[in-house]
A protein has these predicted regions:
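One-carbon transfer enzymes
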Residues: 1-213
Length: 213
C-alpha cells in the first residue's frame, strides 16, 4: 500500500501549482503527501513523483523511496528527451501520448507503469496545452496510488529517438513563411521566457501571442 509520498519540483517551473494540487488530492485520499522544491527536502517513503524536474537525481535521492516516477509526454521509447509536447506540435501531432515511468540512470528509459493521451484540437497555445499537461500529470499520479496493487510495469520496446532541448533561438520566426505555416511554432512559444521573434533590416522584433475573444 502507498502511504508516504513526496512530490518534487526542483525549479521555478510553471507546473508548481499543479504539483501543489496533486499534494492536496493525495492528502484527501488520507495519504501523507508533501511537496519538496529541493532534492534534499525529499522524504524517505513509498513514492516520489518528479514533476518538471531539471536536475539529475543522484542514487542517494532515488534510494529514499521505493518508487521514483516521472511523467513523460511521448510514445516511449520514441521521443525521449526535452519538451516532447512542443516538438510533437511542431510535427503536426494532436494526439500526445503520456507515460508514467520509473526514474532510472538512463534518460527516460524506465519501465512504463501507466499511459494516457492528451488530445489537442490544433489551436491550443502554450498556456492551454500546459494546463492539459498539468492535469494529466495529476491524473496519472493519483491513478498510480489508487491502482498500485493491480499494476504491472512494462519494459520499453521499439525504436528509440530523442528530442533535443529547446532554446530561445528556436522561437525565431522565418519571415519567408506564411502566417499559417508559422502557427505551429507560435503555439509553442512562451511570451515571457522564450517569445517569438524575427529579424528584419538589422532589427530584432518580438511578437507576443494570445487568443483574442
Amino acid at each position: 500500500m502507498i502511504e508516504n509520498i513526496t512530490v518534487l519540483v526542483d525549479n521555478d517551473s510553471w507546473i508548481l501549482p499543479y504539483a501543489k494540487d496533486l499534494v492536496d488530492e493525495l492528502n484527501k485520499l488520507d495519504k501523507n503527501a508533501t511537496l519538496a522544491q529541493h532534492h534534499d527536502a525529499v522524504n524517505a517513503g513509498d513514492v516520489c513523483f518528479f514533476l518538471g524536474c531539471t536536475k539529475i537525481a543522484a542514487p542517494s535521492l532515488l534510494s529514499k523511496n521505493k518508487f521514483n516516477l516521472v511523467v513523460h509526454e511521448s510514445a516511449l521509447p520514441q521521443g525521449k528527451g526535452f519538451a516532447p509536447i512542443a516538438w510533437q506540435i511542431l510535427e503536426g501531432q494532436n494526439e500526445i501520448p503520456v507515460c508514467l515511468i520509473e526514474a532510472c540512470d538512463d534518460v527516460d528509459a524506465g519501465d512504463i507503469w501507466l499511459t494516457d493521451t492528451i488530445t489537442l484540437n490544433g489551436t491550443e497555445l502554450a498556456c492551454e496545452w500546459r494546463e492539459l499537461q498539468g492535469l494529466i500529470s495529476i491524473k496519472l499520479a493519483v491513478r498510480f496510488v489508487n491502482e498500485f496493487g493491480s499494476l504491472v510495469p512494462k519494459k520499453q520496446t521499439g525504436q528509440v529517438s530523442f528530442y533535443p532541448r529547446r532554446r530561445a533561438s528556436d522561437s525565431e520566426l522565418d519571415v519567408s513563411k506564411t502566417l499559417a505555416e508559422l502557427i505551429p511554432l507560435l503555439r509553442t512559444v512562451d511570451n515571457e521566457d522564450y517569445p517569438a521573434f524575427f529579424e528584419h533590416e538589422g532589427c530584432k522584433y518580438k511578437l507576443e501571442i494570445s487568443k483574442y475573444e
